A protein has these predicted regions:
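Short, contiguous hydrophobic alpha-helices characteristic of membrane insertion segments
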Residues: 9-31
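N-terminal leader/signal peptides at the extreme start of proteins
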Residues: 1-10
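N-terminal helix-rich module
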Residues: 2-3, 24, 28-47, 51-58, ...
C-alpha cells in the first residue's frame, strides 16, 4: 500500500492571480485615499482658522482690547501660518495668544479680501486700521482636488466656513 502525502500550498498561478487582483485594488484605492487626505487637511485647516477667529473675537470682547489674527509672515500670506495677537492702545503687540504653523503642503491659502489680517475691536466687530467696517473671506484651495473652502466674516465679525465642490463658480468667496 502506497501512501500519498498531499502537500499544501499555493500554485504559482494562484499566487500571481492574487497579486494581480491586489494590485488592481490598490491602483483604484490610492487616488481616492489621496483625495481623502487632502480634503481632511482642508477641513482641518479651515476649522482651525475659524476656531482661532472665534477665540480672537472672544478675547477682544473679554479684554476690551483690539485683537488681530494675521499671517505669521506678511509677505507670504496665510500659507505661512497665522498668529493671534492682542494689541495695546498704540497698536503695538501686547501678547501673542496663539500661533499656528502651516498645516499642509497641499493647501493654498489665498484670495484674501480682508486686507491681510482680521482685526477685532473691543466690541467684537471686524474693523480695518482706520476703524472702517470690514467683511470678507480667506479662501483655501486644495491642490489635488477642485474643492474650495473659505472662512467668511459676516457683518458682526462672526466667522463661518463655506465649502464649494468646484473652483469654478465658487459662491464661497467671490
Amino acid at each position: 500500500m502506497v501512501l500519498r502525502i498531499r502537500q499544501g500550498g499555493f500554485t504559482l498561478v494562484e499566487l500571481m492571480v492574487t497579486i494581480t487582483i491586489l494590485a488592481i485594488l490598490a491602483a483604484v484605492a490610492v487616488p481616492n485615499l489621496t483625495s481623502f487626505i487632502v480634503n481632511s487637511q482642508l477641513r482641518g485647516a479651515i476649522s482651525t482658522l475659524q476656531s482661532d477667529a472665534m477665540n480672537a473675537r472672544a478675547e477682544a470682547i473679554k479684554s476690551a482690547k483690539t485683537v488681530v489674527l494675521r499671517p505669521l509672515v506678511a509677505a507670504t500670506g496665510w500659507t505661512s501660518g497665522w498668529q493671534t495677537v492682542v494689541l495695546d492702545n498704540a497698536g503695538n503687540d501686547l501678547q501673542t495668544i496663539a500661533s499656528r504653523e502651516p498645516s499642509s503642503d497641499y493647501l493654498t491659502i489665498g484670495k484674501d479680501n480682508v486686507g491681510g489680517l482680521i482685526r477685532y475691536d473691543s466690541a467684537g466687530y471686524t474693523r480695518n486700521a482706520t476703524g472702517a467696517f470690514i467683511a470678507g473671506c480667506i479662501r483655501f484651495d486644495a491642490g489635488y482636488t477642485a474643492r474650495v473652502s473659505a472662512l467668511v466674516l459676516d457683518a458682526a465679525g462672526r466667522p463661518r466656513t463655506c465649502t464649494s465642490p468646484s473652483t469654478i463658480n465658487s459662491s464661497c468667496c467671490v
